[in-house]
Swiss-Prot record:
SUPFAM superfamilies, per database record: 6-phosphogluconate dehydrogenase C-terminal domain-like, ClpP/crotonase, NAD(P)-binding Rossmann-fold domains
Subcellular location: Cytoplasm
Record organism: Escherichia coli O157:H7 (strain EC4115 / EHEC)
Residue span of region Enoyl-CoA hydratase: 1-190
Region (3-hydroxyacyl-CoA dehydrogenase): 306-714
Annotated catalysed reactions: a (3S)-3-hydroxyacyl-CoA = a (2E)-enoyl-CoA + H2O; a 4-saturated-(3S)-3-hydroxyacyl-CoA = a (3E)-enoyl-CoA + H2O; a (3S)-3-hydroxyacyl-CoA + NAD(+) = a 3-oxoacyl-CoA + NADH + H(+); (3S)-3-hydroxybutanoyl-CoA = (3R)-3-hydroxybutanoyl-CoA
General function of this protein: Catalyzes the formation of a hydroxyacyl-CoA by addition of water on enoyl-CoA. Also exhibits 3-hydroxyacyl-CoA epimerase and 3-hydroxyacyl-CoA dehydrogenase activities.
GO MF terms held by the record: 3-hydroxybutyryl-CoA epimerase activity; enoyl-CoA hydratase activity; long-chain-3-hydroxyacyl-CoA dehydrogenase activity; NAD+ binding
Gene that this sequence comes from: fadJ
Record's protein name: Fatty acid oxidation complex subunit alpha
EC numbers for this chain: 4.2.1.17, 5.1.2.3, 1.1.1.35
């Protein structure tokens, strides 16, 4: 075989063929269309060698088997027919692997996803390592697609239809022990003996498929199947609100294969794959995938980052505890927490303990590994142990004088090279750095709550922040598992600035008589994970509204909240979920009780009359203000590019991923159409809906953001 081949064949002395997967020049193995000829050439050699006893597929990469198919292949398809042909090519290749007359085993270490799992499913047996890096799944639904190389047909027959549907519909990834329990793999072994274990399995007859559990056998029959697909269909429709066509097609294709046989199933799979590849939802989801990949590669500045050997955190509250957890347990960097109250340190340590202990209980982590990670976190009530910290993250109250004091203390007690990163959500970084002796080492690092779950961070340099400080902070965020966007030091930064008018409009509609549940349901139907009122309750009404006066002072009355509404709510001791009462009432702590709207909220805020708006009208008012503000952020270079703007909105506030972010959504509607909608709303509801100048100009010229914009902050 050629040296540049991604698949190479070697035959051992015991007549076991080893096919090594190693895509040249890439960290991850991904399947490309041009590899088909390489695999077919190997299959031909295997068929011609009558001495062979078995075959093993193994990866040469240190941490992945095959991470999936190369998504660029789909983008290169111009029609549904071309994408369908791509799927049929994949199906045929997998069928040829499966048709080999000798046992074929997949030796899996690391990520085995998408097309990688489909290749493993085409093998007659699978062995995987017990390493935490080893995960198996079919995540195509997250790109608005379905598995196109036989996965929708082979997986249900191997592990049962209900379990397979859960995996395919959600993109759920299984760890090794889960995969073994479900029958997805035949054995789990240490990495050091993976190849030998796979070879031993290949020397035996083809592994016989293990009998499915009784429940799965019942569900595979006509009556059980009809009941299952009806129930799963309802549940899926409720979860997706009909916004993700891939889920409907997955159900259709899996059911076709079970009811009409694999031949019909494969045919339906290929056709559905081709059609889904051309949907705007899949195109938007793939754009988010590519954009997030680019952001993760972006170093933030041209300067080399400084070393990061240890980090300090000021404040042991909820944010401080979460930041300590991702720094120690995700980034693997030693962390020291300073809090004036020993109880604060204990809370922060308990935060990490709870996260890690949950992983131990779910068998995702060994107790010894938990203890090793916890040992990276320590605490103090003074600055002992801070002298040589490379970066300090401040997570204290939103008070400018306090944060300036923290800067002074860090400069006095830490090394000359130490970076000071403030987790402020609203205060200008330039003001925090105003009295610093080393202002070039002061930067904003805005996490979102809950820290361990929210993927986005905003990195905010002020005018005097050095390029190396930016690069080092970006480096830390990536190590913490975050997707960082660099934003300009202007009031509200980016995410809170586009979120505030969206929340304000929801509150304004409440005062006009719209119901809480109706507003929230309208935005969930639009595609947000939760509605704006529920979001405010979850964040904390006191916390979430604190930024409104800051934004109003900076940008004028378009950011003003309805008069006295917020103060009335806060004066009634309503903070949201954290104290059990906000717009909603919550059950006892520790119980998963249903929240319900508190009817007392309406007289409290002076709501009058009955709501008259439809769900689309409610969503339109909230979303249009968000879009308008996002365009202003591009115009003012608050964000470096529309790419960052889309990623920030999707990862920071849950803007519907299937729409691709605010800028792709504007492009899909057309800037001219957005301007027309906003002008109509301005006539009906006031000047806050006046479209910004940039949007009007683009509408007049018929321009779109993703084709014309490439702004960069200097």
């Amino acid at each position: 075989m050629e040296m540049t081949s991604a698949f190479t064949l070697n035959v051992r002395l015991d007549n076991i063929a080893i096919i090594t997967i190693d895509v040249p020049g890439e960290k991850m193995n991904t399947l490309k269309a041009e590899f088909a000829s390489q695999v077919r050439a190997i299959i031909k050699q295997l068929r011609e060698n009558k001495e062979l006893r078995g075959v093993v597929f193994v990866s040469a990469k240190p941490d992945n088997f095959i991470a999936g198919a190369d998504i660029n292949m789909i983008g290169n398809c111009k029609t549904a027919q071309e994408a369908e042909a791509l799927a049929r090519q994949g199906q045929q290749l997998m069928a040829e692997i499966h048709a080999l007359p000798i046992p074929v085993i997949a030796a899996i270490h690391g990520a085995c996803l998408g097309g990688g799992l489909e290749l493993a499913l085409a093998c007659h047996g699978r062995v995987c390592t017990d390493d935490p890096k080893t995960v198996l799944g079919l995540p195509e639904v997250q790109l608005g697609l379905l598995p196109g190389s036989g996965g929708t047909q082979r997986l249900p027959r191997l592990i049962g239809v209900s379990t397979a549907l859960e995996m395919i519909l959600t993109g759920k990834q299984l760890r090794a022990k889960q995969a073994l329990k479900l029958g997805l793999v035949d054995d789990v072994v240490p990495h050091s003996i993976l190849l030998e274990a796979a070879v031993e399995l290949a020397k035996k007859d083809r592994p016989s498929s293990r009998p499915l559990p009784v429940r799965e056998r019942i569900l595979a029959g006509p009556l059980g199947r009809a009941l299952l697909f009806k129930m799963v269909g309802k549940k899926t429709e409720h979860k997706t609100q009909g916004n993700y066509p891939a889920t409907e097609r997955i159900l259709e294709v899996v059911e076709t294969g079970l009811a009409q046989g694999t031949s019909s199933g494969y045919d339906a799979e290929a056709r559905a794959f081709g059609e889904l590849a051309m949907t705007p939802q899949s195109q938007a989801l793939r754009s988010i995938f590519f954009a997030s990949t680019e952001v993760k590669k972006d170093p933030g500045s041209d300067a080399p980052p400084a070393p990061l050997n240890s980090v300090g955190i000021l404040g042991g509250g909820l944010m401080g505890g979460g930041i300590a957890y991702v720094t120690a347990c995700k980034a693997g960097i030693p962390v020291r927490i300073k809090d004036i109250n020993p109880q604060g340190i204990n809370h922060a340590l308990k935060y990490s303990w709870d996260q890690l202990e949950g992983k131990v209980r779910r068998r995702h982590l060994k107790a010894s590994e938990r203890d090793k990670q916890l040992a990276l976190i320590s605490g103090t009530t003074d600055y002992r142990g801070f002298a040589h910290r490379d970066l300090i993250i401040e997570a204290v109250f939103e008070n400018l004088e306090l944060k300036q004091q923290m800067v002074a203390e860090v400069e006095q007690n830490c090394a000359a090279h130490t970076i000071f990163a403030s987790n402020t959500s609203s205060l200008p970084i330039g003001d925090i750095a105003a009295h610093a002796t080393r202002p070039e080492q002061v930067i904003g690092l805005h996490f979102f709550s809950p820290v361990e779950k929210m993927p986005l961070v905003e990195i905010i340099p002020h005018a005097g922040t050095s390029a190396q400080t930016i690069a080092t902070t970006v480096k830390l965020a990536k190590k913490q598992g975050k997707t960082p966007i660099v934003v300009r030091d202007k009031a509200g930064f980016y995410v809170n600035r586009i979120l505030a008018p969206y929340i304000n409009e929801a509150i304004r509609m409440l005062t006009e008589g719209e119901r809480v549940a109706h507003i929230d349901a309208a935005l969930v139907k639009f595609g947000f994970p939760v509605g704006p009122i529920q979001l405010l309750d979850e964040v904390g009404i006191d916390t979430g509204t604190k930024i409104i006066p800051v934004l109003e002072a900076a940008y004028g009355e378009r950011f003003s909240a309805p008069a006295n509404v917020v103060s009335s709510i806060l004066n009634d001791d309503r903070k949201g979920r954290k104290n059990g009462r906000g717009f909603y009432l919550y059950g006892q702590k520790g119980r998963k009780s249903k929240k319900q709207v508190d009817p007392a909220i309406y007289p409290l805020i002076g709501a009058q009359g009955q709501g008259r708006l439809s769900a689309p009208q409610v969503a339109e008012r909230c979303v249009m203000l968000m879009l308008n503000e996002a365009v202003r952020c591009v115009d003012e270079q608050v964000i470096r590019s529309v790419r960052d703007g889309d990623i920030g909105a999707v990862f920071g506030i849950g803007f519907p991923p299937f729409l691709g972010g605010p800028f792709r959504y504007i492009d899909s509607l057309g800037a001219g159409e957005v301007v027309a909608i906003m002008q109509r709303l301005a006539t009906q509801y006031g000047s806050r809906f006046t479209p910004c100048e940039r949007l009007v100009e683009m509408g007049a010229r018929g321009e779109s953001f993703w084709k014309t914009t490439a702004t960069d902050l200097q």
